[in-house]
Each structure stands twice: as C-alpha cells, then as structure tokens.
C-alpha cells in the first residue's frame, strides 16, 4: 500500500481520516506542529505500530514542508482555518498560502498524487474571506499539474465538529429563543465525517478520480432553521427558532471581534450562512457508489458532550 503524507491528522476530520487510511493498509506520515500533538497521535494509534510516523512542520512554513514530504507516495491535505479575528489575513495565510506551500513541496519532491479537502460552494465573493481563501487554495491545486482530486463537503457533522457544536452552544443558553441569521431558509446538505473519511480513502485508491472534484453532501437538504430545531431535539431542549436580521447579528459579532470576545460565529461566517450550500442530493451515491448517512436523529453526541461538562 501507499505511504501517505497527511496534514490535519489531529483535527476533527483528520481524526477520522487517519484511522481510515491505516485500516485500508496505508502507511501514514502525519504533519504535526509540535511534539505534544505528535505524542497524542502516537498514543491514539498505538495499535498500528510502524504504520504511523509523525513529522514536525506547519503548512504556513514552506521550509518545514520540503523535507517532511520526502519518501511519500501521495498527499492528503485536510488543514483549513474556518475563521479568524484578523480581517481574513489568517484565512488567506493558511487556506490559500498553506495549500500553495504544500503543492510546491509536492512538486519539488516529485509526488504526483494530491487529494485536497476543499469546501462546497466556495467562490471568490467580496467580503467572504473564508470562501475566497478556500477558492484560491482550490485554484492552486487545479493549476498544479499534479494528479489532484478535490473533495468539496457541505457542513460536516460528527463528534468534535465545529458548526453543530456552535449551534448546540446557542441552544444551551437558558433562553426560550435561538436566533438564526436572516430568514433561516438557507439550505445545507450536512455530511457525516465518517463518509468524508470514506470518500478520501476511496478516491485515493482510484486513479480515475485524478483531475476531478466531488461534492460531498448528505442524502437530503436542511434549512438553517431545521438544523437548529434538530439540534434542540437532540439536546432535549424546547426552543423557539427566531429569524433575525443579518445586520443586527453582524453588529453584535463585529463588536465582539473588536474587543476579542469569543462570539460563536465570526461576521465572515454570518455572511457565508446567507448562501445555500448544497450539491446534487444523490451526488455521493451516483459518483462514489455509496449512500451517505442521514443526519436525522443522529446528533446524540452533542448531548453526550454536554453531559461531560
């Protein structure tokens, strides 16, 4: 099997992709930023001795990548920053710049195979720093001349996720109302993190996937309002979901950013939530040959996390 260089192996998606790669018989070289993260990975995957190696580095440090990728057959790039408090500069540095650094390292090392985790619906839009930075990262991969494959998921759900835990935090607030930006009708296609990991392993082993992008979404669409209601049900909370004007929520979020108060959602994310984030409802089954898991009734992990606090 192949020797895979993996970024983001200690993150939410990576914590599912890494064991999936090991289970498929691959050797994994995981990029980590410090020795503490390396030790956590080694302990977590102690049952696979010899199959996991860690190397220190950072995607924003081009020099650290040059030797780190040596000896690998393929690269799986998962690292992405979802938001920042720096006007988009950090998003650009990680999502666009970090991807460019890794592509350059692959080219220099002669590594042809490159699987990149993009995002569904990202375009270069004025004021949408996350979407623009991810779009520029994807453009770099497409223009690389490598045997690339891009996976573009909608919202990803699963234990340790970002978005659904943020919604859960809002639902946990002891108030009868949970605000959603705009009219609450923006549509999403939540996809289970286990299905994302399955897709990574599948395309990695399929030469025909080179030069292609795949949209990853669940088997049905959910509005923002429906997602919030589903989270409330999972937590056993009775809440009224109240649409609120985006400018009002952006004002509150903007004030929190100005004083560095950790408001759950950055203003950039609020703008992004105004757009639909969906692909073909049968896209995964048609393109990858498996039926993705439906999110409905499966958010119990949010309650379990609360019970540990």
What are these regions (language model features)?
Residues 4-26:
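N-terminal Rossmann NAD(P)H-binding glycine-rich loop of SDR-like oxidoreductase domains
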Residues 202-265, 279-309:
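Mid/C-terminal beta-alpha module of Rossmann-like enzyme folds, strongest
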Residues 81, 89-144, 149-151:
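Conserved Rossmann-fold NAD(P)-dependent oxidoreductase catalytic core, especially the SDR/UDP-sugar
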Residues 46-101, 105, 120-124:
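NAD(P)H-binding glycine-rich loop region in Rossmannoid oxidoreductase-like domains
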Residues 169-191, 195, 199-203, 207-210, ...:
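A conserved pocket-lining segment of Rossmann-fold NAD(P)-dependent short-chain dehydrogenase/reductase
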Residues 126-128, 149-168, 187, 222:
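Flexible, glycine-rich beta-alpha linker
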Residues 60, 122, 156-158, 196:
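Conserved sequence/active-site signature of Rossmann-fold short-chain dehydrogenase/reductase
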Residues 31-36, 58-59:
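N-terminal Rossmann-fold cofactor-binding loop
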